[in-house]
Amino acid sequence: MKFSTAAIHAGYHSDPTTRAAAVPVYQTTSYTFDDSQHGADLFNLAVPGNIYTRIMNPTNAVLEARVAALEGGVGALALASGMTAITYALQALCSPGSNIVSTSQLYGGTYNLFAHSLPNQGIQCRFVDHDDLEALEAAIDDNTRALYCESIGNPAGNVVDLKRWAEVAERHGVPLIVDNTVATPYLCRPFEHGAHIVVHSLTKYIGGHGTTIGGAIVDSGRFDWKKHARRFPIFSQPDPSYHGVVYTDSFGEAAYIARCRVVPLRNTGGALSPFNAFMLLQGLETLSLRMERHCSNALQVAQWLEKHPKVTRVNYAALPGSPYRETAERICGGRASGILSFEL
């Protein structure tokens, strides 16, 4: 299925009861069970199905499947905001005493989370420059649980060499998490460059209309949690918080995204409403068309600003003189999305 087709159709087949061609809004909190045993099996994760909309919902499930398909992942989790997605992506991996290593070129909300909020939970963030691979390697130790970067930085517009970051992650046996909000999977699919987990603020380009807050975590299914069980015992040992489930046994390659759903989401409740999922699906349908226009418009503005006598510098990776032009060619096909900045 081509990208633009998947953005419209992935994850949904006509509703078997109503034959609805468009994705329905399942505005419900709860679901009926066939009998008590069926209910018990659902809560024990022994069979697939809906339990409670805080954890799962049919409308949200379509959005999750669609975003996962566009990114090339095995599963996704839709959440109330991009910041919820980033927080849960890390809480599913970390505990007090853990650390993460992140690029210092970050969205402001993410920086505040890493620099101020996570330390209050006993999780340290070590910041490095995105192109200093020696510093990145040196910052990793036995308590490191993830590397983190943005494919295209917001608002700096820097482009990270994801392949080189992924090589470092592989050498040390830790997952690479990439915020792909600005690039979107239309320009960049981080899993193809070796990343293991992707996060999104769906609010921005995927939603596209400025009406709806939302976020998502996408799991590549490629990180071997069993191989790295010493660093990540939470995936291969019984979880006492959820009926003793062993994620690698019950969910296989989708162990990580399953834990995101039944631990941080279930326990802290940053759920996306079904109506917001529906609104985000409307925006997602036109992502291909909008990203083409975003890129062409931003490039024209950047080129105009470059010639302006009062502008000393334009930060846009698609410009020939950008220090990120070569990386943008490899990571994003030479395009740099719709965010640019300039100096007077």
Question: Which residues are covered by each model-predicted region?
Answer:
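Conserved N-terminal alpha-helix of the aminotransferase class I/II PLP-enzyme fold
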Residues: 30, 35-87, 109-117
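Glycine-centered tight turns that cap/initiate beta-strands
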Residues: 72, 143, 310-313
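Structured loops at beta-to-helix junctions and adjacent beta-edge loops in soluble globular domains
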Residues: 11, 28-30, 283, 317, ...
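N-terminal glycine-rich, Lys/His-bearing helix-loop that initiates the first secondary-structure elements
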Residues: 1-50, 335
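A short acidic, often aromatic-flanked loop/helix-cap motif at beta-alpha or helix-coil junctions
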Residues: 33, 132-136, 322-323
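Conserved PLP-binding catalytic core of the aspartate aminotransferase-like
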Residues: 313-344
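Short glycine-enriched loop/turn motifs at secondary-structure junctions
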Residues: 46, 70-71, 210, 334-336
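Conserved PLP-enzyme active-site core in the AAT-like
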Residues: 9, 13-16, 76-307
